[in-house]
Amino acid sequence: MLLKVDNATKRFGGLVANDHLNIEIEKGSIVGLIGPNGAGKSTIFKSICGFNRIDEGNIFFNDQRITHKETYKIARLGIACTFQQAQLFANITLEESVLMGAYCHQHSKKKALEIAREKIAFVGLAGHENQQVSRLNMFERKRAELAAALATQPELLLLDELFAGLVPTEVGEMRLLVKRVNEELGVTLFIVEHVLRVIMSLCTKIYVLEYGKMIAAGTPNEITSNPEVIKAYLGEDYDGTSDKRS
């Protein structure tokens, strides 16, 4: 098992954001996490990456306990993440931004630069290396953040609403790119997303959160036919093609 979340609970004061969550992700898989806004999806992502410290339970990566490890140590072990709002420094170039990710494992500037340029090309931004991040459009910025995450050479990549704000043609392109990350680079993916047609087409397993509790887990077909999931999130009129925004 590549990642195991064992009874993880996270509280913010009196609010229980994650309530005894259990998640298992096998190496090479693409797994989804869905649920209404405020369900606790981003909270568990941040806990896995080390930005939050869970109050109860444990998190294991490659059978190693990473509960409460520092973020940079978790990154060096092989976990990377992207955020809904691209977390890039606006006043530096694309190449410099991705290079920062490459230095996670590389001390050689030459090798790090080689990795950075390789990932920039992989996400389709070759030729933009010297462009300031602030001048990139949303679709380009999301691909730039993906390149920076890939430059850390992760085994597991957490994608938090990577498709948010993209127009349908961009969603299609990004979906193919994400599929290539898994198939060509061998990176295991854990995806939080409201664009359900993406989740349903990419993932072999999906977890569903509501009010911090896990209410379902299964294949896309099992999830879309689950009465509790339909009531809590999908809605009675869900036809398998529409997307959720709340």
Provide a role label for each language-model segment.
Residues L2-K4, A8-S246:
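Glycine-rich phosphate-binding loops of nucleotide-dependent enzymes
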